[in-house]
């Protein structure tokens, strides 16, 4: 992701997920993140809480500027953080993610979502459902505004909580340009 290179003033934490059963790895032989509250004893939500507490205590981070980003399962966890820790998260930058159907969003937060139309791991139709839910919660209705190649911006009627999408033609990939777009978006959003 190299966010620290693009935003050297930020404190960036890259935690490593533990082995986690997923639909694509039922045995849980690869690292990942919990997708819904209650999974895995909430180990990942508890880890997030501990990271935030440590960062606040040790580095005096700006409480209004805590963000979540991720790719694939990490994006799913970022969406879970929006659902379960909206008081902590200012905005989300996710690539090839979705919100687990057992979860719901109740608090508006700015979102930049990057999705591939040919994604067979996180099917585009499922990613699109999550984007639509985010737009609904954020009050970002309407057709949106073009904002560049593959880009659409959905301004919010509820304040500075837009939904911005980049929908590219490829599959389940982290595009080379994704981190640049995510950092640009996150830098301009803080909690109200």
Question: Which residues does each predicted region cover?
Answer:
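Serine-hydrolase catalytic machinery in alpha/beta-hydrolase-like enzymes
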Residues: 1-67, 80, 84, 165
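Active-site loop/turn elements of alpha/beta-hydrolase fold enzymes
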Residues: 15-19, 97, 170
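Primarily recognizes the serine-hydrolase "nucleophile elbow" in alpha/beta-hydrolase
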Residues: 57, 64-109
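Alpha-helical scaffolding within the catalytic cores
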Residues: 1-2, 95-103, 146-156
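Acidic catalytic loop of the alpha/beta-hydrolase fold
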Residues: 118-122, 172-173
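Stable alpha-helical elements in mature extracytoplasmic
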Residues: 44-51, 73-81, 85-88, 126-130, ...
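Short alpha-helix in the alpha/beta-hydrolase fold that links the catalytic acid
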Residues: 123-136, 145-154
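C-terminal catalytic histidine-bearing segment of alpha/beta-hydrolase fold enzymes
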Residues: 114, 140-192
């Amino acid at each position: 992701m190299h966010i620290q290179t693009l935003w050297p003033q930020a404190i960036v934490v890259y935690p490593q997920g533990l082995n986690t059963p997923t639909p694509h790895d039922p045995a849980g032989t690869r690292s990942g993140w919990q997708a819904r509250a209650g999974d895995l004893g909430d180990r990942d939500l508890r880890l997030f809480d501990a990271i935030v507490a440590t960062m606040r205590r040790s580095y005096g981070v700006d409480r209004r500027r805590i963000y979540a980003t991720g790719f694939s399962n990490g994006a799913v966890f970022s969406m879970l953080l929006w659902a379960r820790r909206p008081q902590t998260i200012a905005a989300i930058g996710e690539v090839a993610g979705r919100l687990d159907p057992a979860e719901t969003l109740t608090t508006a937060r700015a979102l930049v979502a990057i999705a591939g139309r040919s994604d067979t791991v996180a099917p585009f139709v499922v990613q699109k459902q999550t984007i639509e839910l985010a737009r609904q919660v954020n009050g970002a209705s309407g057709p949106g505004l073009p904002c560049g190649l593959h880009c659409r911006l959905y301004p919010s009627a509820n304040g500075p909580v837009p939904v911005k999408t980049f929908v590219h033609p490829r599959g389940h990939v982290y595009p080379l340009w994704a981190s640049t777009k995510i950092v640009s978006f996150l830098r301009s959003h803080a909690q109200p």
